[in-house]
Curated annotation (Swiss-Prot):
Single GO cellular component term: cytoplasm
HAMAP family, sorted: Nudix_RppH
Database matches in InterPro entries: Nudix_hydrolase, NUDIX_hydrolase-like_dom_sf, NUDIX_hydrolase_CS, NUDIX_hydrolase_dom, RppH
Record family assignment: Belongs to the Nudix hydrolase family. RppH subfamily.
Named cofactor requirement(s): a divalent metal cation
SUPFAM superfamilies, per database record: Nudix (SSF55811)
Protein name, per record: RNA pyrophosphohydrolase
Gene Ontology terms, MF aspect: mRNA 5'-diphosphatase activity
Function: Accelerates the degradation of transcripts by removing pyrophosphate from the 5'-end of triphosphorylated RNA, leading to a more labile monophosphorylated state that can stimulate subsequent ribonuclease cleavage.
Family matches, as Pfam families: NUDIX
Secretion signal, residue range per the UniProt entry: none
Keyword Hydrolase: yes
Gene: rppH
Length: 159
């Protein structure tokens, strides 16, 4: 499902623990790290996509997390030209994302990257809230900055 501007609707997931760290996931067989994210299917709400992607990519169920916040609007990034599939129709030039801030309420050992036949990640770790800005691929950096900045006020306060 690609919109008329060439952007694929998508959800981004920022999962926090009780001390305000975020889950940072390593893409399978790569030294590339990112937040979990995934496309929104036809007739699926962003929240429905969030829970489907959370389960597919991280192994968590709706009862394992609490939604703390969501970005107000869509945040967009363009793919580098080398990643645009120019022979695909409709042409996808990037992603438009709704970002969700979640708190893990279930046990940490419920995080599993290997529950699907085609896992996207093969590892994860907790990192400080702003750490991903310096690590994510360049073309996603501005969207990460905007999402983290907008959602930061809703981050659980450390006791």
């Amino acid at each position: 499902m690609i919109d008329s501007d060439g952007f694929r609707p998508n959800v981004g997931i920022i999962l926090t623990n009780d001390v305000g760290q975020v889950l940072w996931a390593r893409r399978i067989n790569q030294d590339a790290w990112q937040f979990p994210q995934g496309g929104i299917n036809a007739r699926e709400t962003p929240e429905e996509a969030l829970f489907r992607e959370l389960n597919e990519e991280v192994g968590l169920e709706e009862q394992d997390v609490k939604i703390l916040a969501c970005t107000r609007g869509w945040l967009r990034y363009r793919l580098p030209q080398r990643l645009v599939r120019t022979h695909s129709q409709p042409l996808c030039i990037g992603q438009k994302q709704k970002w969700f801030l979640l708190r893990l309420t279930g046990a940490e050992d419920r995080v599993r990257m290997d529950l699907t036949g085609k896992p996207e990640f093969d590892g994860w770790r907790w990192v400080s809230y702003w750490y991903p800005l310096g690590q994510v691929v360049t073309f996603k950096r501005e969207v990460y900055r905007r999402a983290l900045k907008e959602l930061a006020p809703r981050l659980p306060v450390r006791d």
